[in-house]
Amino acid sequence: MKKIILLFVFLVFYAPNALFAKADKLSNIPPASLEFINLEPQECNIACLFELLKKGRVFSFISRFGQNISNTQLLNAYYAILSGVELNSAEAIFTPINANTKIAVLIPKQSIKSYSFIVTNAILAYTASSDKAVAIKFFITKDESTLDETILALQSEGFKYVIAPITDAALPIISAQKYEKIFFYIPTLHASLAKEYNDNIVFGGIDYESQISALLEYANNKIASFGDGSRLSQLLNEQVKNFAPNAYIDVIDNKSVDLKSHLDNNKALQNASIFLNTTLLRASLLASQFRVYDLEPHAVLCTQICYDLVLFNLLRSADRAKMLVASSFGDIDDEIVAKAKILGIDLKFDRVAYPTIFGLDYIITQFLFNGTNARFNEIINNGQVAYRTHIYK
């Protein structure tokens, strides 16, 4: 039986509110996956799910479990089963062990949206492959408006190590002097986004600036960049401009389906090194339309936001012939990768999941069980995970 204990606490308040670039080949062979298929047409409500647990019908329980389920006992049972923990009762309530090592996971669900599931499942994948006696407790709260009281709550419970997938709006909160004895690891932000931060905070976010710098080694002097108006896209385009002040920047709203006005007879794109700082779908659409409008880029450049096999599978070989994609991820333990796939997470590509489990591994091997071999090769440098950039084509 796994020694890691997972606890989920839902604190929902309704108050108002490093760098060495090299070009590698990316395999297009999709990894194996395991899915639980629901063959029952009827909806399974809370009573139905409890009945399935009572009867020991685990696979039916997993396949019929919906994302709208908020019952704490059922959520605990769901994550326990996926983590390989045996259940002995229908209530499926975890009993805390007398562990000297505890880690809190602080999730402002409305702020990070779908990333809350990614962070949760990435942590579960790691814990399912670990034999360390660690108690992990999830504090799921509304947004930044309730973070302060949530941190006070976990602090009162004796938690000294916190994984916090937050936005930059929460940085002033966790940087408060009253929390200086708590170690915070932030997988969603890079240290460059913080004006100042304390020694008790480590950032695990992707270094997009280094990725852009590495990609520019394959560029010519004519730089162009597309964005989609999102906050991350704006940041990436600003960094492109920092390296290439004369770069041509074009923003295409994600709702827009008209690319002709952006591509047709656009001399700024001809023989240019073009950054696609957009969503995956928009990037694939742009890359496939260059030839349609007789555009021949010198290179098509993508950062981590487009590092996904889906992009390569969507494009024909001719459309990706000049494409280079940057990634900061290193090798990952196969066991963790396999368990993450069961939970619907691809650790080799997900830009939040990989930094999350790196942080969990870092806390366990450097603080809780100092001397234990780390499962990742990256190091911490000045409060930031030092990733090595790889270029794939």
Give, region by region, the residue ranges found by the protein language model:
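Extracytosolic ligand-binding ectodomains
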Residues: 2-10, 18-393
